[in-house]
Amino acid sequence: MQRERMSKKKISQVHCIPSGDHILMTASSSKHIPHIRFYKAWKGNNRFCCGGRLIFGPDVSSLYLTSFLIGAPALTFCIRMLVWIKRGDPFFNYTVLASGFILTLLDFTFLMLTSARDPGIIPRNKTSMILEDDSDSSLTQSMEWVNNKTPNLKIPRTKDVFVNGYTIKVKFCDTCLLYRPPRASHCSICNNCVQRFDHHCPWVGQCIARRNYPFFICFISSSTLLCIYVFVFSWINLIRQPGKLWRTMSDDIVSVILIVYTFVAVWFVGGLTIFHFYLMSTNQTTYENFRYRYDKKENPYKRGLLKNVKEVLFAKIPPSQLDLRAMVPEEDDMTIASNDSEYESEYTSSVRYDTEMGGKLIKRDSPRKLPLPTRNLDDIKDISDNYDRSTTTREDASDRDPSFFSSQLDLPK
């Protein structure tokens, strides 16, 4: 009888898997649990390729359209240049052909570097710390609580930090269970909090943020140059032909189509390039540009033209906080649900409020306490201390990117 009772009991174990600067804690039975790659247990909406080595957004299929819009006219131009080579002046035409091919190759390279890499996703908080009403009075500084439906848990929805002498409010993300660092935002399409979030680009199928923004700048710049290149040399090929221009155009319809196509395209991609060069020169993101314009606030990240450009284009890209090929237990009790089922998490309140998904309320039958990720409050406080300095030392303090502040933990291979 005693052995039977012992066999019925399940001895629980805790598995701790570091993910970036977060620790995944999962409760499981003592029996062997199969492990899977971390990207297979991913709770966001991203799609993966090559065993988790490449990460895309949920709308990655738009890459086919973007590749076609770039590749089709570029290939047509190259084929047309081969025809012109046979008609004479091979050195000039070969040079134009080789330069166009290299520019197209660079454009596709920057497209993949933008779309197929981690844009700066902040790992979701997997630790839970339940606070009662009187457990920690230092966190009850706001009249607006995350737990507006959970009276036993008090979490201030916003925290004030100081960046370059300006007060910045950092918000609590109810989906990722963490306080977002300055300049970070939650992408409702990918369902992730992202460092220095600029926007979600449907043309590349990925968030544009801290770790891929320089490549995005190079991508749209090379696309603009490619449009101008094809436009100019298509005109040159028409002008170089003997006879009247209108007759030459009627005989070379392909070049005319390329001229019209690139003329229309350059207004879109060129305008986007100019806009982002303006954002880069003022050290703003697209999200901040519209927000500051609406709120009529001053940009706290301005450092001067040269320093702004250096920070955006030439600063060292921080390593990813994700190790998507790490092995994690297949059964994870402390799951944070994805966008489609985020309100079915094992750790949620009877009515959960999501600030990022439009404040949707979903009721559950059994009320549970919401896990509170307060570990990164100390990190955010460090940001406030580092940036609350005198004017003479602000430039030195602003050399570090406030959106990337946490230390990294190596995941098991």
Curated annotation (Swiss-Prot):
Active site feature: C201
Pfam family for this entry, one: DHHC
Composition skew (Basic and acidic residues), residue ranges: 376-402
Origin superkingdom: Eukaryota
UniProt note on tissues of expression: Expressed in flowers and pollen.
Biased composition (Polar residues): 404-413
Region: Disordered, residue numbers: 364-413
InterPro entries reported in the protein's UniProt record: Palmitoyltrfase_DHHC, PFA4/ZDH16/20/ERF2-like
Role: Palmitoyl acyltransferase.
Family: Belongs to the DHHC palmitoyltransferase family.
Domain-level remarks: The DHHC domain is required for palmitoyltransferase activity.
Protein name: Probable protein S-acyltransferase 3
Species of the source: Arabidopsis thaliana
High-level lineage: Eukaryota, Viridiplantae, Streptophyta, Embryophyta, Tracheophyta
